[in-house]
Amino acid sequence: MGMDRNTIIGFVLIGGLLMAMFYFNSKSQLAYEGEQKRIADSIDQVKKKAEAIVAKTTVAAKPDSASPSFLNFGFASTSQEDSIVTLENNKIKIAFHNRGGQPGKVILKDFKTYDGKSVEMNSGRFNKLTYRINTPLNRSAEVSDILFTHQPVQKKEDGSQSIIFETSDSTGKKISHKYTLSANDYMLQMQISFDDADQLLSTQDLNLLWQNEAPYIERDHKYELTQTHIGFLEKGDFDFEYVGEGDQKKLTNTKWLGNKQQFFLSTLISQNEFKEANASWYLPKDSKDHYLIRTNHSFVCPLVRQGNHADVPLSMYFGPSDYNELKKHNVGLEYFVPYGNGIFAFVKYINRYFLLPVFDFIQHNVMNMGIVILLITLLIRLITSPILYKSYLSGAKMKVLKPEVDALKEKYKDDQQAFGMEQMKLWKSAGVSPLGGCLPALLQIPIFMSLYYFFQSNIDLRGKSFLWANDLAQYDNIASIPFSIPFYGDHVSLFTITAVITSLLISIYSMSNMQDNSNPLMKYMPYIFPVLLLGVFNSLPAALTWYYTVSNTITLILQIIIQKYIIDHDKIMAQIAENRKKPVKKSKMQERIEAMQESQKKLQDLKNKNSNKG
């Protein structure tokens, strides 16, 4: 009982598709490396322009210190310098600056960085949320430069907290920023309000600028970068941009726009829709800059008017890319979690509606996440075992028919079309499908790929240890190499080695039972592919390589059990003999195939006849 040619083709196709998937997943990193020089040059140009603009703006906007009416650009404030006030709940702590009345450093209480520090977002001088307003005496200023006065933090019985920042000029024009943070939530509600909006703003909409810097959070910065995207919901459809491709994206009718790192999001959301949004970003020259990416996102926000009063209702999400957490906000943020992309986008439905509920159920009853992965993999392999059984059963039938196929091959060795037709007749009379070994293997691809994306994207694996792996969301490192080996790296992942070894064992066992080893491609490809995995898997999260090890081990055990103890050769031969006694009923598809083969045979015979006459 061995693996027939079609079964091997199926597994080779799986390997090819898997390699294609790794290619697409590394697309952002390849693009990033290809654009480094261009990005570095563009950053220098942008910085020079920015410095010139800042210098001009500073001179133009510099108030006359001798004239109190020009202090704070003509807006009232009880403070002469920036101060900080905080809102917090059990999940998040947000610091607000009265300069600009805007959010500053965000601390996620339940998460740590790779070096044990609290995860901080929106931290640093680069981060700001601002817009331009008209000030007295026909001047203008960025609201991020204006000092606001804030009221005391309001705490409600439901656990929510809110704060209002206000400023006004001598004529009564007033600006207020209200922020509300609910209990047990990462979403920050925000409302910008204007009294006398037509005088404060030069346009009918609010032109908002959001600058955000994504810091290093994970240990493997290079892999973290490949998982960093600019995501948006435009006209009701989610899409994203690799940060290594281009540096800007223009959008219309956009619900939200945000930056996703490997496991964390920073997102600005409109209660209505942004009329326009322009996303732009650039990458650091090297790791010494201590950030992954900087973004400059601009928005055209519609005003909700009531007479001369206008509001801009917004929300900001700073938190984990947890599918369940994001989904509860009902604005489509859960699409950020990459449960399936590119040619494998369809597997996201398997992950969302099957694997995630199963995973949640198991992890609530099992403490160790490595055991959770083992149990899920075992469950999936048992569910797909009938497919595996059909594949090996088809191989066993092919092996029984092999002597007759070899006889036909010898008889029609000079006429491949005739051989193909007779082989089809033989298979049909015996009740054997030529695709019986290939299709079951291909049908396993969606399951395999859904598990791949699921374990790669699930934040619940982050920081969880198992055996020698300290973090299942990062590669396991049992030894460091003082230099980098091409296509491998500078470290040794033991789970990768176990995955490769189990893959080789499957190949060795399968090839030992294969009835036809004459084709060099069929003979060596199953051995080459596992070795290629050594370089591909070495920097992948330990959860993936552990899953692959478990999956291979279970597959090998099932393969031995099915072939040694379940498949009965005598029954197969008896079934084939019984099928031959039955009248052969051809399907329409088979009739068309045989008709085409017959036509091709007649055409070839005619060509041969004319050739002989010549």
Language model region names:
Residues 33-34, 38-42, 66-78:
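N-terminal, polar/Ser/Thr-rich
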Residues 77-337:
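Soluble non-transmembrane domains of integral membrane proteins
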Residues 1-51, 96, 190-195, 209-224, ...:
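Helix-loop-helix
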Residues 44-69:
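Short extracytoplasmic
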Residues 19, 28, 66-71, 92, ...:
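A general marker of short, structured functional hotspots
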